Amino acid sequence: MATPEFDLGDIKRRMQGAVSSLSKDLGSLRTGRATPSLLDPIQVEAYGSSMPMAQVATVSVPEPRLLSISVWDRSMVTNVEKAIRESDLGLNPMTEGQTIRLRIPEMNEQRRKEMVKVAHKYTEEARVAVRHVRRDGLDILKKLEKDGAISQDDEKRQAAEVQKATDDAINEIDGVLASKEKEIMQV
């Protein structure tokens, strides 16, 4: 069996991937404030296949609680409208020619708390992903040390670097959560 290689850069990249994934997931949560990323999960039936909203229209934010969607192809307006209505966002599109407007309703306290719970769930998934990457890195180091490829001192030093990368990623995840929580709870 080939000896596994230890690459701290790869471990950091994988941890950063978990943070990026969390940011994307949290970006799609409704906060009562209009953001183009709110429509990222919506798929539109276009030209015989399912496409992301960004590939059929431009989404802008003319007001804090209003999204404006400029559909590029006039024939796609009804499909975009249908995709928005069928999404679980609970938004009601208003169409004016090739432009669709979405007013983002105020969220009540109960809905805000539900969104915070969902944000915590996404955050815990990201923390678990980071911990899995840490475990993989530490397992490789232990195997290398056991096989005599690195000294015990090197194993301990590199394990400390893996732990530092883990702590940095977890702190970044906590920061992303705190920011999103503040945004959700803001009235």
Curated annotation (Swiss-Prot):
GO terms for biological process: cytoplasmic translational termination. SUPFAM superfamilies: Ribosome recycling factor, RRF (SSF55194). InterPro entries: Ribosome_recyc_fac, Ribosome_recyc_fac_dom, RRF_sf. It is found in: Cytoplasm. GO terms for molecular function: ribosomal large subunit binding. The keyword Cell membrane does not apply. Transmembrane segments: none annotated. Keywords: Cytoplasm, Protein biosynthesis. This is Ribosome-recycling factor. Responsible for the release of ribosomes from messenger RNA at the termination of protein biosynthesis. May increase the efficiency of translation by recycling ribosomes from one round of translation to another. Belongs to the RRF family. Its main location: cytoplasm. Signal peptide: none annotated. One of its GO terms (cellular component) is cytosol. CDD domains: RRF. NCBIfam families: frr. The lineage of its organism: Bacteria, Pseudomonadati, Pseudomonadota, Alphaproteobacteria, Hyphomicrobiales. Coiled coil: none annotated.
